């Protein structure tokens, strides 16, 4: 139904967005360079947020209707499970559902902040990293609540790979490791502000090699 598919699409978009944020060199030629990778990262993040809102409405709407006696959502008792893995996942449904709403609200706030042009970059740099923590919470939410039958189809392994790679990317972000191997040392030798286009030009002299960069 809409609830499950919106959740899958949202997590898929967010996972790919985080994978792109890792700045994997081999992806740059395929995606047209780092600037286009980040543009895709941005729009996948926005897509993940929009579909997450749809997912949230799909979850809340039946309860809203039930509150006015328009419809009563069926809540059949879950059958007792003999599969040990499935039984464990069922015991985790409560915590997984409980973490969903706070993570969703945090996602909205952090993505909106990231899109505000007037929000200072020095704060954006710090708050944007919090999205990695939110993502990890949503991975737990998704792993536990995704339909067990999906794991037997191609969808399950695909989502597992995406979320595993996304989790690695989130952990690298939390540990401030993104782009570390590509950093170069240098000193600013001059700068010029262009008010017409609101661009600051900076001249820099490198004091170390810039991995992967070729002048010209």
Identify the meaning behind each predicted range:
Residues 1-216:
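FNR-like FAD-binding dehydrogenase module
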């Amino acid at each position: 139904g809409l609830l499950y598919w919106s959740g899958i699409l949202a997590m898929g978009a967010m996972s790919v967005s985080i994978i792109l944020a890792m700045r994997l060199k081999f992806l740059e030629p395929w995606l047209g360079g780092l600037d286009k990778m980040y543009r895709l990262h941005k729009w996948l993040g926005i897509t993940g947020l929009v579909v997450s809102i749809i997912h949230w409405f799909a979850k809340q709407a039946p309860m809203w209707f039930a509150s006015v006696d328009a419809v009563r959502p069926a809540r059949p008792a879950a059958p007792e499970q003999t599969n040990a893995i499935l039984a464990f996942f069922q015991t985790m449904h409560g915590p997984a559902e409980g973490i969903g709403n706070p993570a969703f609200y945090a996602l909205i706030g952090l993505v909106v902040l990231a899109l505000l042009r007037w929000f200072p970059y020095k704060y954006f740099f710090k708050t944007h990293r919090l999205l990695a923590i939110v993502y990890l919470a949503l991975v737990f939410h998704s792993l536990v609540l995704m339909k067990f039958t999906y794991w037997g189809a191609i969808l399950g392994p695909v989502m597992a790979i995406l979320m595993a790679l996304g989790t690695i990317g989130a952990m690298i972000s939390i540990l401030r490791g993104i782009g570390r191997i590509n950093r170069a040392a240098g000193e600013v030798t001059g700068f010029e502000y262009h008010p017409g286009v609101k661009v600051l030009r900076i001249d820099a002299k490198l004091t170390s090699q810039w991995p992967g960069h070729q002048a010209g």
